[in-house]
Amino acid sequence: MSSLADLINLDLSDSTDQIIAEYIWIGGSGLDMRSKARTLPGPVTDPSQLPKWNYDGSSTGQAPGDDSEVIIYPQAIFKDPFRRGNNILVMCDAYTPAGEPIPTNKRHAAAKIFEDPSVVAEETWYGIEQEYTLLQKDIKWPVGWPVGGFPGPQGPYYCGVGADKAFGRDIVDSHYKACLYAGINVSGTNGEVMPGQWEFQVGPTVGIAAADQVWVARYILERITELAGVVLSLDPKPIPGDWNGAGAHTNYSTKSMREDGGYEVIKKAIEKLGLRHKEHIAAYGEGNERRLTGKHETADINTFLWGVANRGASIRVGRDTEQAGKGYFEDRRPASNMDPYTVTSMIAESTILWKP
């Protein structure tokens, strides 16, 4: 091998049947991602074929030093775009040795909601628009911004093209392709309103798989920014002032909404979401009050409002849905740092299971 790059890209399939499985879990902040790798004897196609594992929870803020073992359960498998071949990424959730979900394990409660027969019958679809900001490593300032200064006002950057408008496209496109390789249902990307901010969309994907895919897409993005020497930020308002924040708009539909007469089902679901507005806001991401101000294409955090084609609303219904009399709606309240397990399951619970 002539270089480090050759070794990184070394194909093991001709020399061994063994594979590398990268186990991924959510750390103590509820947002940080951790991972470690292990060797397995051969290719794996289902999480049930994988062994549970453990890690030092005292080093992630998830367990005390005198009882530090946390157990991770494999839940979803993806192809590894970094090692390739038969190697895999494994999304896990975390439990105590006694089998109880630890506090940062939001997947466990979400799975119970998605396994409810009423929710299963409705075949919930999600499309999640994950916005994020790329920061310069040493100064934590958006890429493309002058050090200690600001770029020109917002306007030319949204879906912009050119060296003075789009900053970090190589990272964005690498991430797009890596997610498709991994088996994540990424449906698109675009540059956002604030320079240095981008978005990728996951979906439509059914049930809890939508959240699994968003988490692994975040992991892949963080690995790519690591290689690029850039810092990934999911802060919902990374730059104060007259700059757009970052959200995770969540598009949602049920089988009943997608069928004839579904628009009435949509309106009833939105009414229920309005009745639980405070509960949803409390679960929709840390620091969201800095983003949901009623400006920059947001509704005020204390006000629930819905409308057709209204990007200043809490819930937006598309013109095509209104005209067809069926379809989906967009919950614009979730922040970029939201937990997709919490948000997707809470929307399903409020619209299908909850009785006012």
Swiss-Prot record:
Domain GS beta-grasp intervals: 19-99
Modified residues (Phosphoserine): S2, S48
Residues recorded with modification N-acetylserine: S2
GO molecular function: ATP binding; glutamine synthetase activity
Top enzyme category: ligase
UniProt keywords, alphabetically: Acetylation, ATP-binding, Cytoplasm, Ligase, Nitrogen fixation, Nucleotide-binding, Phosphoprotein
Name recorded for this polypeptide: Glutamine synthetase cytosolic isozyme 1-4
The protein's role, per its UniProt record: High-affinity glutamine synthetase. May contribute to the homeostatic control of glutamine synthesis in roots.
